[in-house]
């Protein structure tokens, strides 16, 4: 029986970097709980900020938090009011000194989490699920993605029996490690119940530079021996 592997965790250390960078011995559990608390605060306070990713790095008593947002202006606010309010909320929740950095996402259509949240929002607005899925897939492919897969599960269309609907466009090599695949999960809270939305976006292959250097070294050795 097959088991599904998380696309990000499957490629961690190969072509994906850690989103929490710190080391702890006995304080590992406490740091992990603090990270979960920080992520929940960001998710709760930055609803309209379109945050695609949160990176956490610890150095001493300071926590460096980097938010990747498609709407950085909303997160910053007029005169930086929203940033200061968010920073104070994070510091009160964790008890650590927070260094907050906000970076802009150039193409929100290529961020799987933002696409999933967009589809979930449209489902909550009673947009037909097939139309929402196809339009999201079309916009993502127009930006330059090589493949996309969207899966919705729940009482789609108000039916009494839950079912699964899937939309695929382009390629989706889930078994290839060098494939740059982004994954996002969102939930739509409708009158008929909860609908889960999963999105996979294939952005191309990431070829490590080590292979190129090894290939050039082999060619140089062959030329020297000749």
Regions found by a protein language model. Name each.
Residues 1-226:
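RNA-contacting regions in translation and RNA-metabolism proteins
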